[in-house]
Structures are given as C-alpha cells and as structure tokens.
Amino acid sequence: MELLIDNRQDRYEITDALIELINKAVEACLIYEGWEIDYEVSLSFVDNQEIQALNHTYRGKDYATDVLSFPLIEENQGLDLEEKLLGDIVISVEKAAEQAKEYNHSFEREMGFLVVHSMFHLMGYDHDHDEATADMRKREEAVLTAINLLR
C-alpha cells in the first residue's frame, strides 16, 4: 500500500506517528473489505480556506468541510482490478483540530476517523440515505475498533 502525501498547510505538524496511524487506518479498511493492500491513495492536508474552495468547486457548497473524497471508481462501475490508485483524500487539518476539540477526543482519533470515512467513500460506499449511513458507520466503527482508535 502506498500513501502519497502532500502537506499543503503549515499550521499543524504532521508527525511520523500520525502518518503511521493513517497508513494503519488505510490498510485496515482494505483488509476489512477483503481487498489486497497494494493500492495507492493520495492524501492532501490543507487548511480551511483551501478545502472551502475545493468544496465550492466540486460540490457547490461554499463552506469549509472536514474531508473530501475523490474516488476513481465510478458509481456502479466496480473496481478495475488493474487500477491500483483508489483516489484522492483531502483533509482540512484545521477543521479536524476544531472537531477533535468539539467532540472531546484526540486530534489523532479525529484524523484517523476522517481517513477511514474517506477510504470507504473511495471504496464505493456513501451515506446518502439512512440505510447506507448505518452501513457505513458500522464499517467505520469496526475499523476504528480494530486499530484501537476509540472515542
């Protein structure tokens, strides 16, 4: 598994320990779904201003969000087994820090959750209705528990 990291913010330190945790989270998602772990995922760390611009451009929503997912798997297309790049994850580190404080858990737990959440989007899951949301939450909690990233 290769994680291609682009840190485009300078407000928060992205430590080696955090990168190790993120790698573990990405691999745990693939393993949970029974996928091989030889995929590439692009992960960009940005600030609220940049993610707001991306959110506006790609989703028509003019506010900062925590994470954006850009899967290379088209809906209902399935995975091309020859394609090894799953897609791109963009995380607002600034928003993650705000949410960690708001939810009263660690920054690492919030970053891990956002990566896991986004990975399931890259793997074709969504939360566009109640049943899909419940299914996605179940998967997220299972992976977070497996890597001991509890609330």
Swiss-Prot record:
Binding-site positions, Zn(2+): 117, 121, 127
Cell compartment(s), UniProt: Cytoplasm
Secretion signal span: none
UniProt xrefs under InterPro entries: MetalPrtase_cat_dom_sf_prd (IPR023091), YbeY (IPR002036)
Cofactor binding annotation: Binds 1 zinc ion.
GO cellular component: cytoplasm
Assigned EC number: 3.1.-.-
SUPFAM superfamilies given in the database record: Metalloproteases ('zincins'), catalytic domain (SSF55486)
A single BP term in Gene Ontology: rRNA processing
Function: Single strand-specific metallo-endoribonuclease involved in late-stage 70S ribosome quality control and in maturation of the 3' terminus of the 16S rRNA.
Protein name: Endoribonuclease YbeY
Organism this protein belongs to: Alkaliphilus oremlandii (strain OhILAs) (Clostridium oremlandii (strain OhILAs))
